[in-house]
C-alpha cells in the first residue's frame, strides 16, 4: 500500500490523483494528462485543475493557477510520505472544514441530527489506497487497512465460489453533499433523503472504511441483495475479515435497512 502510484492524496478542497487513472476531457487535457504524475482535481465539481509532472505544477487553464486549495494540494504532493506503521491511526485525518455551514445551507441542524441518530461526524483521511476497481471500472479508493482486508475477503469468497463486487467505496463530504443537492432538485424531501442517506459529514463512506457490496446479476444497493448467496456468505464470513453490516433492520440510526453496506471495523479499532 506504500506505492505512491496507487495512492489518492486528499485535502479539504482538492484531490491529487495518480496519473493514468482519470479520463481526459478534450484534446488539450489529454496531452497534459498523458505525461502527468499527478492530476489535481477539485472535489466540489470534479473539475481537473492542474497536472504535476516531474515536480512541476501546470494548470490546465490560466485561471486555475490561483484556484482555492491548489497550493495546499501541491504542498501535500511534494511532502507526502506514506505511513509504514500498521493500524488505523497511521493515516492522518483532515480537519472538518466548512461542513457545518454547508449543512446549514441544506437545512440540516448538525447537532440535532447527531443527537437523533447517534451518528458522529466522520473526517476524511489524508490519503487513500487503490483497492482495485468497482463494478463500473472506476478506481476504488479505501483506507489502506480496509483495502488490505477487502482484497483478502474477495479472495476468500472466490475460493468458496462467491463473487463479490464493490459498488462504491470512499466518498468525500462534497460528493455526499452533491447527492443531497441532486435529490432535492428532483423534488425529494430532506426527510425522505435522510432515511436512505446519512447526512453529509456523517456517512461511513467518508472514512474510506466502508463500501457498498454487490454481486454479478444483482442491481446495486437494493434490498434484494439479502436473498443472494453473496449476502449469506458475508453474514457468515465478513466478521472474520473485520467487516460488519452497518445498517441492519431496526438499527438505532433511523437509516433504512442496507444489506449491501459493510464497514471495516475490527475489534481493535472499535475499543473492544
Which residues does each PLM region occupy?
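Extracytoplasmic cell-surface/polysaccharide-interacting catalytic and binding patches
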Residues: 1-167, 182-272
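Short, well-ordered surface patches within globular domains
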Residues: 171-177
Amino acid at each position: 500500500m506504500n506505492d505512491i502510484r496507487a495512492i489518492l492524496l486528499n485535502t479539504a478542497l482538492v484531490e491529487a490523483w495518480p496519473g493514468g487513472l482519470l479520463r481526459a476531457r478534450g484534446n488539450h487535457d489529454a496531452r497534459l494528462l498523458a505525461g502527468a504524475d499527478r492530476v489535481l482535481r477539485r472535489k466540489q465539481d470534479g473539475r481537473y485543475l492542474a497536472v504535476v509532472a516531474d515536480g512541476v505544477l501546470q494548470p490546465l487553464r490560466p485561471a486555475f493557477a490561483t484556484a482555492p486549495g491548489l497550493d495546499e494540494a501541491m504542498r501535500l504532493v511534494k511532502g507526502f510520505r506514506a505511513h509504514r506503521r500498521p493500524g488505523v491511526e497511521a493515516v492522518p485525518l483532515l480537519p472538518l472544514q466548512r461542513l457545518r455551514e454547508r449543512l446549514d445551507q441544506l437545512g440540516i441542524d448538525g447537532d440535532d441530527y447527531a443527537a437523533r441518530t447517534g451518528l458522529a461526524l466522520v473526517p476524511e483521511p489524508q490519503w487513500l489506497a487503490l483497492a482495485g476497481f468497482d463494478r463500473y471500472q472506476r478506481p476504488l479508493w479505501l483506507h489502506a487497512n480496509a483495502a488490505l482486508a477487502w482484497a483478502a475477503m474477495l479472495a476468500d469468497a472466490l475460493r468458496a465460489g462467491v463473487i463479490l463486487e464493490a459498488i462504491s467505496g470512499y466518498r468525500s463530504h462534497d460528493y455526499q453533499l452533491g447527492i443531497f443537492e441532486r435529490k432535492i432538485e428532483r423534488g425529494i424531501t430532506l426527510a425522505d433523503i435522510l432515511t436512505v442517506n446519512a447526512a453529509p459529514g456523517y456517512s461511513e463512506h467518508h472514512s474510506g472504511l466502508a463500501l457498498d457490496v454487490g454481486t454479478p446479476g444483482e442491481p446495486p444497493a437494493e434490498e434484494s441483495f439479502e436473498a443472494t448467496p453473496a449476502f449469506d456468505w458475508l453474514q457468515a464470513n465478513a466478521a472474520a475479515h473485520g467487516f460488519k453490516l452497518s445498517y441492519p433492520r431496526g438499527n438505532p440510526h433511523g437509516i433504512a435497512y442496507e444489506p449491501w453496506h459493510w464497514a471495516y471495523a475490527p475489534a481493535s479499532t472499535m475499543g473492544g
